[in-house]
Structures are given as C-alpha cells and as structure tokens.
C-alpha cells in the first residue's frame, strides 16, 4: 500500500500525505519542511482555511484515479505543478488555523470534528459487508465540537486495511484533514514525532458531552432488545429516543476514514453521534416531551357505567334540597391532571351527576337560597375541557361576588312566595311528584348518550354560549331591581313551579308537538290563552290542581330554531340568555312587558331562574315582541303617511303645472285674439285696482297686472273678455289720462313692447333670404356620393 511506503519517510511527509490524499493514496515525499514556529495564530481564518482545501479534494481524486494501480511508480509521476499547488495550499491554510481558549491552535477540535464528518460520509462498502447509510449533511463546527467523542486519537498507523475504492468515496468529504495535520505540525514543531500526534487530547467540553450523551439504554443494543425494554417502560420519550439509535447502530457499523479502526480503544461503534438522527434525538431529549404525550383518557368511555346517572332514591320535599358540590371540587374535576382521569369516578364524584341531581330536585326551601349559590359549572372531565381552564380563576372570583350579592337579593323575593309554594295542596304535591318522576325517568335514560357525546355539548355551546360566560352583572341587577320594585308579588306567586323550582325540561330539544301541550298563538288563527293565567286543569302535566299554572311543554320546542338563533351570545355585562321570554323575537303570548329571566344551559337541561321577584310582566331592559309592536306599527303608519304625503305633493305639483300651462295657453290665445292691451308710462304709485277701475269703462276685464321697471317707469297689462272692448280701449284710452299724468302708451300686447325702441325687425326681409345659397357642395350629395368622395380622398 502507498501508506506503508510513505511511513518510512519523514514525519512531515507522513502526516501531510495522510491528510491530503488519504491513507491509501500515493504520497509526495519531495516537499520541503517548513518552519512554522514564527506564525501568529491570531491571524488565522477558518473560512479561508476551509475554502483553500478545495484543491486537495479535487486533486486527491485525480491522484487516486491516476496512480491507483501503479504503487511502484508513485514518486516518479507526481509533477512539479502538483508540488507547487500543494505548497500554495499549505501556505494559505497556515493563516486559517483556529485558536482555542488557551491561545494554542485548536488541533483536537478540528480532529474531532473530522471524525464526525468522515463518519457521516460512510464508504460505499464496509469491511463487514453491510450497506452504508445515506450521506448526511455536513454539520457545522459547533456540532463537530459537541458531537465528537472526548478521547479521539489520530492513530494513522493503525488504519492499514482500507481499500482504494473505499477512500475514493471519501475524497469529496476530506477537506478538513489537511488542517488537522498542519495544525499539529505548526504548534508541536519541537517534537515532530507521531507519538505526539497520537497522544490523546482532553476536550474542554468533555464534561458537557458526558452530560449530554448520558443514556439509560446502551447505544449498541439490538433493535429487538430495545423494543422489549421500551415496551416495559411507561415513558414514550425513551422509546422514541432509543429505537433510532439502535437501528442506526445495526445498519451502520463503524469504519471511519480516519484510522479509528474497530480494534482501536476509541471504537466509535454504536456511538450516538454517528448520524443526524442522533442529533435530532438529542434535541428532542433536551427540549422535553411534555407536550408530545397523548391524552391518557379518551373522550368517550363506552365500557364504563354512566357516571352521570342520577340517584332514583331522591324524593321531593319542601325543606330538603340536595347540597350541590363545592366550587373547589367542581373546578378541580375539570382542571385535574391526566393521571387522575385514568381512574373511574363514582357517580357521586362527577360534576354532571351534581348537575342532574340539582336540576331534578325541587327547590322548595327558599331559605336555602339565602346561602351562597353554586358557581358556574364546566361541562366535562376530559382533555377537551382544558380549553376553559385559563379562565377558571376569573370565573371563580366572579361567581363568589355573584353569590355574595345574591344573598340579600333573594331575601325579599323569597319571603313573599316561599310559603305559597311550600303550603300547596295535596293535588299540588301530586303534581310535583309526577313532574319530578317524569324528569328522573326521562333524563338519565334518554339523555345518557347525549351527556356523553361531545358533539351535543359543542352544539349547546354554539347555540346558547358557554356556561362560563353566563354570569350576572351586578350593575344590571341593581338597575333592574329599581325597575322591579313597584310590582306586586301577587302575580309572581302565580308563576308556575315549573319555572321557579328549576326543574329539568325534558322536551326542550324535542321537535315533536302534541295537541295537549301545543302553544296557540293569536296570529295563527287558533284560540290562545295567556301563558300565566290560571287554567282550570294542567293538561300538559296531568295535574288536577286548579291554582297551578300550566306552561305548555312545547313552549321551547315549538320554535326551537328561532330560540336558538336569538340566544347565541352570552356576555358578561348582559349575561341574560336571549330566551322566548326575554330579548328574543320569538312570539311568546305574554303581555307587552318583558322579563329579565336568565336561562342557564347546564348538562343539556334548561334551567329557568327568574330575576329576584320580577315576573314576566315587569318592564325591564329586554324587549318583547308586544312592547316593540306599537313602535313597529307606528313606524309603518308614519311610513304610509309619508308616502301618501309625497304622492299628494306630486299630484299637487302636477296640477299646478297643468294650471300654469293652461294659463299660459290662455294668455297666448288672448294675445293672438288681440284682447290684451299694454298700458305704459303710468305712475309708480298706481295700483292694480286703480288701473282696473279706470280701464273697465271700455268693457269687462278678465285680468289686470301692474309691473315696475328698474328705471322707475311702470306698465301694466289689461286682458279684456272680448276683442272689441280691447280695440275700444286701445283707441280711446288716452282720454283717461289725468292732468298730472303723461300720455299712456297703448299697444296690443306682444314681444315688441318689451324691447328697446331701436329694435329692427328683420323678419320683413325673410322673403329675400335664400337658404340654399349657403349650402356647400356636400349638402347636395347623398350618402353614396359622400362615401365615394371620402374613399377618393383616402386614396390620395
């Protein structure tokens, strides 16, 4: 081999040829030794150093192809030009040596970087016959420093089994080798021996490398062992981290271009720094995989029992109310960790169970309402509920303020109608029991799948807003309290227990309509009853109570689309949901007043909470269809009246224009009939009545007008009924002049009377005028003649 021949020469030739050409390429022994002791390492530039090695990469391939099969004539076929170029490269690269923190040339840094570089550019055929992996991108200098092993040695003499073909594939990645050898030669000029070069260099960042490269699993384990071990481990991070290392360790046994043989103590076999995959794995390990772990609890558990099933043992009583879960437990269930979701919750621990229990129990004991009300409920205990956790603290604070403010609000409201509900008759008790049993039977069974379905919850949030936003505004409550103060509590006592008690409305989202519970509207042409009038029988709930009220169950199912379209937005300032009773356009057969009724959609149940003691008749900020109907009707009436006025004005203007045109025609006719006399040079103080009286002696006058000129002279027009009278006035009108007046100017009315005296009438000479004399030659031509004339002019 060429390497064995060169090993007998000087140390400089040995190192230089090994770096530039390779361990199995012909070497050049004629290069003179250079004294590099006076070089200043501070002037070295890494970029120019790496750029200057382009010749080495190209020439090494040329030399490999040219002298591959002739090792005996190696030194005879290297010409002087290659020697000169080699010297030029050496001289240029001496100025680009990097410097470490101690002021010495960073030889081992580049050497370690070369180990990684040559390792990435693996040869096409390995000594053990395994196929090489794909060539990875050349890492940066920082990656070379961090990813190189700590005790890399340059044992060039140990690499003696590589073939020429293996090295030929490395010629394009061998650029940094000359810098390694020359750097060693430049700063270790005192001892030029290969033993110095083979001395292990301790890396400054070895401690960092030990910390970064620490791994629980050995890097040289087989893929089957890794799969078995990772199956036993719970962390998915180790499984994703060790398998790429083991796969690359199996597919890529180590054969480096540098003489790090598998027999050397620095065997990089199974090293975690063989390729880019290990770098990516290391970056994942450093950054952490907390956000990559999948949720441990699926959104839907079909194999478990329904945790939201209400207890059937609860019985309604006037003074017993099931205590709702506390706020701490309610919010901890929604924002708990994922590990807690893996354990199955009991029915009493789920928040939706508390929702159903609360909604299915009749709240007769209104002294319990004086205590703090439960805060808002969040829907699920799954991973998709975590989106509302960011607002949990704000909602808790708002809910606490709400409950504190609600303590005093319900004292006045509950004291008046508390006894009315609690002291109801036996028939009313039967009615309440039937209602409660119906809600218990329908709610857990028919809505079981709906409560567990994420789409139904999302649909509820879409139409009615999220319950986290359904919070009362204290200012709004105070304002409405002043408005509601003047209303009697007697009408509120007649409100149905269905609304006051917060029972579940089973037919809320059912579109079915029964004849018994169908709501009749007066505009539909059917018989209508007031919603809160006392009905003789509660037909919708089959209750014999005469004093109870029967709000039809289809009130909220008759027109669900309109209700949902009007109740999409919850706001913190106006937290009342737009319901058929309030702020919506749904036609509720109530009075013209509106309500501040608030609807909380919790656990797919529609809970109606009336605002303090204000029934649906009380005037409030919400607008009902009846309150807006008069304004709407008046607007239509005003619009109709305005249209009528516009039409009348147009007709009047049309009539006036017709009258004016008629008067103008009559005037022209009178002028043509010579019935209009022009009277000029009258006194400026002459009135129309005076002028009319003076000229009426000649006949009946139809119209008389007086006009003033700018120069102070006045004139008038007198229209007689008959032409003969006009002629008489024209002939004898001068006799009416007084002694202090000038003579009148009397003419038949025409255009001449309004022009200057020097006006010349040119119409008398109209017979002498020949209009044909002014025509050009083109006027006498027809269209065809004109077209031909134009074409001839274009040809010219």
From Swiss-Prot:
Residues the record lists as Phosphothreonine modifications: 176
Region named Interaction with PPARG: 291-337
Cross-referenced Pfam families: RRM_1
Motif extent (LXXLL motif): 142-146
GO molecular function: alpha-tubulin binding; chromatin binding; chromatin DNA binding; DNA binding; lncRNA binding; nuclear estrogen receptor binding; nuclear receptor binding; peroxisome proliferator activated receptor binding
Annotated positions of the Phosphoserine modification: 537
UniProt keyword annotation of Endoplasmic reticulum present: no
UniProt biased composition (Basic and acidic residues): 217-235, 630-669
SMART domains, per the entry: RRM
Residue ranges constituting the RRM domain according to the UniProt record: 675-751
Alphabetically ordered keywords of this record: Acetylation, Activator, Biological rhythms, Nucleus, Phosphoprotein, RNA-binding, Transcription, Transcription regulation, Ubl conjugation
Residues with PTM N6-acetyllysine: 77, 144, 182, 252, 269, 276, 319, 345, 411, 440, 449, 756, 777
Gene Ontology cellular-component terms listed: apical dendrite; cytosolic ribosome; euchromatin; neuronal cell body; nucleus; PML body
Predominant subcellular localization, coarse grouping: nucleus
UniProt-listed GO biological process terms: adaptive thermogenesis; adipose tissue development; androgen metabolic process; autophagy of mitochondrion; cellular response to caffeine; cellular response to estradiol stimulus; cellular response to fatty acid; cellular response to follicle-stimulating hormone stimulus
Free-text function comment from the UniProt entry: Transcriptional coactivator for steroid receptors and nuclear receptors. Greatly increases the transcriptional activity of PPARG and thyroid hormone receptor on the uncoupling protein promoter. Can regulate key mitochondrial genes that contribute to the program of adaptive thermogenesis. Plays an essential role in metabolic reprogramming in response to dietary availability through coordination of the expression of a wide array of genes involved in glucose and fatty acid metabolism.
Subunit description: Homooligomer. Interacts with MYBBP1A; inhibits MYBBP1A transcriptional activation. Interacts with PRDM16, LPIN1 and PML. Interacts (via LXXLL motif) with RORA and RORC (via AF-2 motif); activates RORA and RORC transcriptional activation. Interacts with LRPPRC. Interacts with FOXO1. Interacts with NR5A2.
Protein name: Peroxisome proliferator-activated receptor gamma coactivator 1-alpha
Record organism: Rattus norvegicus
């Amino acid at each position: 081999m060429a390497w064995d021949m060169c090993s007998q020469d000087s140390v400089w030739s040995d190192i230089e040829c090994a770096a530039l050409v390779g361990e199995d390429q012909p070497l050049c022994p004629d290069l003179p030794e250079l004294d590099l002791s006076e070089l200043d390492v501070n002037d070295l530039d890494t970029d120019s150093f790496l750029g200057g090695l382009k010749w080495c990469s190209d020439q090494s391939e040329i030399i490999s192809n040219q002298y591959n099969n002739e090792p005996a004539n190696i030194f005879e076929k290297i010409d002087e030009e290659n020697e000169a170029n080699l010297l030029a490269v050496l001289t240029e690269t001496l100025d680009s040596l990097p410097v470490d923190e101690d002021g010495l040339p960073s030889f081992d840094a580049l050497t370690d970087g070369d180990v990684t570089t040559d390792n990435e550019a693996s040869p096409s055929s390995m000594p053990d016959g395994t196929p090489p992996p794909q060539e990875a991108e050349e890492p940066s200098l920082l990656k070379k420093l961090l990813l190189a092993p700590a005790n890399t040695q340059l044992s060039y003499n140990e690499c003696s089994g590589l073939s020429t073909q293996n090295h030929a594939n490395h010629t394009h990645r061998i650029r940094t080798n000359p810098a390694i050898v020359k750097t060693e030669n430049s700063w270790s000029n005192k001892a030029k021996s290969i033993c110095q070069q083979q001395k292990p260099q301790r890396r400054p960042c070895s401690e960092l490398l030990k910390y970064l490269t620490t791994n629980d699993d050995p890097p040289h384990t087989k893929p089957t062992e890794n799969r078995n071990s990772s199956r036993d481990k719970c962390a998915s991070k180790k499984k994703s981290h060790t398998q790429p290392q083991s796969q690359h360790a199996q597919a890529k046994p180590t054969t480096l271009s540098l003489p790090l043989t598998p027999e050397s103590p620095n065997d990089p076999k199974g090293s975690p720094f063989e390729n880019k995959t290990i770098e990516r794995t290391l970056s994942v390990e450093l950054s952490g995989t907390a956000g990559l772990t999948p949720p441990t609890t699926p959104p839907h558990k079909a194999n478990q029992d329904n945790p939201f099933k209400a207890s059937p043992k609860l019985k309604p009583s006037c003074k017993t109310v099931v205590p709702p879960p506390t706020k701490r437990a309610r919010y901890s269930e929604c924002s708990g960790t994922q590990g807690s979701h893996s354990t199955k919750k009991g029915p009493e621990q789920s928040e939706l169970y508390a929702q159903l229990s609360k909604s299915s129990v009749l709240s007769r004991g209104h002294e319990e309402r004086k205590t703090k009300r439960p805060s808002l409920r969040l829907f699920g205990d799954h991973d998709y509920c975590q989106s509302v956790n960011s607002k949990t603290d704000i909602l808790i604070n708002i809910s606490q303020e709400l409950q504190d403010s609600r303590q005093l609000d319900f004292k006045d409201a509950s004291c008046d109608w508390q006894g009315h509900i609690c002291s109801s008759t036996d028939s009313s008790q039967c009615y309440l029991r039937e209602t409660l049993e119906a809600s218990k039977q329908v709610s857990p069974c028919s809505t079981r799948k709906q409560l567990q379905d994420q789409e139904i919850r999302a649909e509820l949030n879409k139409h009615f807003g999220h319950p986290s936003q359904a919070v009362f505004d204290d200012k709004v409550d105070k304002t409405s309290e002043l408005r509601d103060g003047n209303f009697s509590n007697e009408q509120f006592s007649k409100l149905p227990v269905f609304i006051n008690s917060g029972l579940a409305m089973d037919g809320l989202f059912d579109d079915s309509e029964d004849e018994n519970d169908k709501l009749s509207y007066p505009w539909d042409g059917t018989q209508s009853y007031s919603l809160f009038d006392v009905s003789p029988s509660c037909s919708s709930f089959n209750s014999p109570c005469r004093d109870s009220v029967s709000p039809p169950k289809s009130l909220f199912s008759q027109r669900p689309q309109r209700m949902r379209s009007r109740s999409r937005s919850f706001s913190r300032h106006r937290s009342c949901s737009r319901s058929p009773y309030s702020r919506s356009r749904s036609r509720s057969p109530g009075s013209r007043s509106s309500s501040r009724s608030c609807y909380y959609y919790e656990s797919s149940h529609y809970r109606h909470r009336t605002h303090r003691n204000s029934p649906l008749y009380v005037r409030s900020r919400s607008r009902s269809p009846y309150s807006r109907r008069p304004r709407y009707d008046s607007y239509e009436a005003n619009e109709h009246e305005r249209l009528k006025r516009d039409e009348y004005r147009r007709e009047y203007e049309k009539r006036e224009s017709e009258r004016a045109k008629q008067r103008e025609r009559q005037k022209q006719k009178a002028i043509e009939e010579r019935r209009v006399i022009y009277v000029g040079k009258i006194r400026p103080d002459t009135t129309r009545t005076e002028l009319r009286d003076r000229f009426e002696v000649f006949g009946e006058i139809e119209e008389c007008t007086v006009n003033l000129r700018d120069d102070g002279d006045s004139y008038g027009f007198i229209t007689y009924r008959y032409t003969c009278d006009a002629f008489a006035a024209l002939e004898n009108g001068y006799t009416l002049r007084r002694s202090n007046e000038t003579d009148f100017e009397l003419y038949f009315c025409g255009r001449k009377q309004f022009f200057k005296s020097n006006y010349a009438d040119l119409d008398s000479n109209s017979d002498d005028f020949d209009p044909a004399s002014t025509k050009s030659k083109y006027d006498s031509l027809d269209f065809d003649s004109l077209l031909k004339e134009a074409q001839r002019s274009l040809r010219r």
